[in-house]
């Protein structure tokens, strides 16, 4: 479906051409002076030099050719040569009627759908999710949803960290605590127990204990390193323990991610990439990409245009051990083999930028990806407390993600009960829905690359640019529609009529921008654009609501038009929040 601005640009381009100028000057954009006009064309300013003519004279010629246009209700030249435009109420109403019929509400579906793998989430197993895991999960989830909405095949991969020293630490600590377990008996040849010798809460206590010991006791650390090495060599007892650790951890991770309304298509792990490493390293050596430097195996990735030093990409340490770079490169090999993606996008902390520059350059230089495969990195900023430092508990520790969610839910529950609009038995469920919106919108409304302050009081407010405010707007629309139906109204009756007042036209204009906004949000990997858009739509609707007697409107055709407009507004808002990864309750 064409954008509203496409129709306008067609009119302007034809008017430029008819006046003897190049049609390419007919581009139209949203006005930066809404007090003067809704849209503007600056083509006359751009064309003045080429035609050696004053821009206001060019603009005058063009405006003269728009006299019979049905698209514009206002078209005027403003010196030094701007063309100010207002769309006609009739044309705008017709455009919204087309939007109503369109499954995608005016957003274009990709003409050439791409296969995109998004690497997000990325927690280490055997450790609880904490607030530092929040951003990758919810930004990646939103980008995945937006990509699918515009027609691409998007594959979400959690990419678990399961193959590093933390495994050796857990195995070593278990051996100290329960040396009698069969996993540590080298002579044991039977089947290993089906049930894990620990619960998730015990596992989450074992790791920090072992990590602390390894920092104080070098002999303990060496044992853990040896256990890691034996695991990676495939020692049966250790592999059985690793399977238990994975099973218990992944079950808990899935529960926590479900509470965030985040899901993954793949639960791939670092260990899945290990089989690809030997052949990959051998290829890089044979083709002369990899060489030894102080015992380590590296690949040069610096480029002449670099403005800062980019160190070589290290493949193997001097003891032959692999690193994160090795695993990430092998994972690219695996993804190319399994999915042949057009793009692989990593949603990770921006402090990992250098790592991914090295990995991407190494993958390209050594031919791990096709020339047209896009490798991209969305580095997000830090979630900080009100003090501007990384978000912590009141005691100064790292806050678990489930505790943050519980705190926000409790805050929302208190506010909803105070509001008394929902019965107590429903208030808990509503608080969870609204609490999740508060968290996700609070994060996603910020540009991903920037640090932001996680302000619980502001994020849980029903006023201002917040998730609860957006949901309150949707619930308000639902309530009006329910009352209309209860009074015998038919939601399918009538059609959207031309706007009868300024606030109604402003709402219609905001709705008409959905398609352009979605395409921009996907191209720029920018969920914050959806947040900014639905905040404007919500404000426009609430202004319209306060200025318009909707249900008490006596003219039946006008009332039906309002109801159709409300349904479209609800659909646009609900589609948008689904792309952000949350939903609206029926009451709040």
At which residue positions do the language-model features occur?
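Short, charged, solvent-exposed linker or helix-capping segments at domain edges/interfaces
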Residues: 94-99
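Non-catalytic interaction-recognition regions
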Residues: 1-93, 107-588
């Amino acid at each position: 479906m064409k954008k509203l601005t496409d129709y306008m640009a067609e009119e302007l381009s034809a008017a430029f051409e008819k006046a003897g100028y190049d049609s390419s000057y007919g581009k139209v954009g949203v006005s930066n002076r809404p007090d003067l006009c809704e849209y503007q064309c600056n083509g006359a300013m751009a064309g003045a030099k080429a035609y050696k003519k004053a821009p206001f004279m060019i603009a005058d010629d063009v405006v003269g050719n728009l006299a019979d246009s049905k698209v514009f209700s206002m078209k005027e030249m403003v010196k030094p040569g701007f063309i100010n435009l207002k769309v006609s109420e009739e044309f705008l109403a017709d455009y919204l009627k087309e939007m109503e019929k369109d499954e995608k509400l005016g957003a274009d579906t990709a003409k050439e759908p791409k296969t995109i793998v998004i690497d997000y989430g990325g927690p280490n197993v055997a450790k609880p999710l904490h607030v530092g895991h929040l951003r990758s999960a919810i930004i990646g989830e939103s980008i995945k949803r937006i990509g699918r909405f515009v027609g691409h095949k998007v594959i979400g991969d959690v990419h678990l960290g399961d193959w590093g020293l933390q495994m050796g630490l857990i195995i070593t600590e278990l051996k100290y605590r329960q040396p009698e377990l069969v996993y540590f008996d080298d002579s044991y040849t039977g089947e290993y127990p089906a049930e894990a010798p620990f619960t998730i809460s015990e596992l989450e206590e074992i790791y920090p204990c072992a990590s602390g010991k390894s920092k104080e006791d070098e002999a303990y650390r060496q044992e853990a390193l040896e256990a890691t090495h034996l695991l990676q060599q495939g020692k049966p007892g250790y592999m059985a323990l690793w399977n238990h650790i994975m099973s218990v951890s992944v079950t808990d991770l899935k529960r926590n991610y479900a509470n965030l309304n985040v899901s993954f298509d793949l639960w791939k792990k670092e260990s899945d990439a290990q089989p690809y490493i030997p052949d990959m390293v051998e290829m890089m050596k044979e083709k002369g990409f990899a060489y030894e430097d102080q015992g380590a195996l590296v690949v040069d990735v610096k480029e002449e245009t670099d403005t800062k030093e980019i160190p070589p990409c290290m493949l193997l340490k001097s003891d032959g051990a692999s690193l994160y770079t090795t695993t990430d490169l092998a994972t690219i090999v695996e993804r190319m083999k399994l999915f042949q993606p057009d793009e692989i996008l990593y949603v990770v902390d921006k402090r990992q930028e250098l790592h991914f520059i090295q990995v991407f350059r190494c993958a390209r230089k050594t031919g791990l990806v096709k020339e047209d495969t896009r490798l991209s990195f969305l580095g997000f900023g830090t979630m900080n407390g009100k003090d501007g430092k990384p978000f912590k508990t009141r005691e100064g520790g790292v806050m678990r993600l489930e505790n943050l969610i519980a705190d926000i839910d409790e805050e929302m529950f208190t506010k909803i009960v105070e509001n008394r609009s929902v019965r107590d038995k429903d208030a808990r469920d509503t608080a969870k829905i609204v609490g999740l919106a508060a968290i996700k919108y609070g994060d996603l409304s910020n540009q991903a690359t920037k640090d932001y302050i996680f302000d619980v009081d502001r994020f849980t407010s029903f006023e201002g640019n917040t998730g609860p405010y957006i949901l309150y707007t949707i619930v308000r629309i639902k309530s009006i529609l329910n009352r209309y139906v209860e009074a015998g109204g038919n939601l399918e009756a009538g059609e959207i009529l031309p706007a009868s007042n300024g606030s109604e036209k402003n709402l219609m204009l905001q709705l008409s921008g959905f398609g352009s906004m979605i395409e921009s949000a996907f191209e720029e990997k920018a969920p914050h654009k959806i947040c900014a858009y639905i905040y404007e739509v919500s404000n426009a609707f609430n202004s319209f609501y306060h200025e318009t007697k909707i249900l008490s409107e006596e003219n039946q055709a006008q009332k039906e038009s309002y109801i159709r407009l409300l349904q479209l507004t609800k659909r646009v808002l609900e589609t948008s929040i689904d792309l952000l990864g949350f939903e609206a309750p029926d009451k709040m």
